[in-house]
C-alpha cells in the first residue's frame, strides 16, 4: 500500500493543491486565467507520471507486454482523468456557484492541455527516459 501511495503522490499533491484553489478561492482562476492553463498542463504531466510509476511497480497485478503498451495505457488513462476533472469543475459550477468553465471552448481547451501535458510526458518516456537493460 505504501508503494501505491508513493506512486500516486505527484498526482495527489497537485490535485490537493488545485482543490484548495478551486474550492476555497472560487474566483482565483477567473482573476488569474493563466493559472488554469498551467494547472491543466501540469495536471496532465502529474497524472502521467503517477500512472507510469504505478504501472512500473513490481506488485502491480497487470503486466503489460512492453514499454509502448505501458505508455499507451498512461496516455489513455490520463484522458479518463482529464474528463473526470472537467466533470468535477462542472459540478462545482453547477451546484456551488463557481466560474471555472467559461464555456464549451474553454472546457475543450482545458482537456486539450491535460492531454498535451500527458503527451509531453509520454514523449519524454519514449525518447529520454532510461530503460532497464538486461
PLM feature spans:
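Bulky hydrophobic segments
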Residues: 1-103, 108, 115-134
Amino acid at each position: 500500500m505504501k508503494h501505491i501511495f508513493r506512486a500516486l503522490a505527484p498526482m495527489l499533491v497537485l490535485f490537493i493543491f488545485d482543490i484548495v484553489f478551486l474550492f476555497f478561492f472560487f474566483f482565483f482562476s477567473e482573476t488569474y486565467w493563466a493559472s488554469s492553463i498551467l494547472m491543466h498542463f501540469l495536471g496532465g504531466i502529474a497524472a502521467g507520471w503517477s500512472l507510469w510509476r504505478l504501472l512500473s511497480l513490481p506488485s502491480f497485478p497487470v503486466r503489460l507486454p512492453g514499454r509502448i503498451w505501458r505508455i499507451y495505457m498512461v496516455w489513455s488513462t490520463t484522458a479518463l482523468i482529464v474528463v473526470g476533472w472537467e466533470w468535477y469543475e462542472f459540478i462545482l459550477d453547477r451546484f456551488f456557484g463557481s466560474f471555472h468553465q467559461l464555456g464549451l471552448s474553454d472546457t475543450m481547451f482545458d482537456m486539450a492541455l491535460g492531454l498535451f501535458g500527458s503527451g509531453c510526458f509520454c514523449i519524454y518516456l519514449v525518447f529520454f527516459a532510461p530503460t532497464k537493460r538486461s
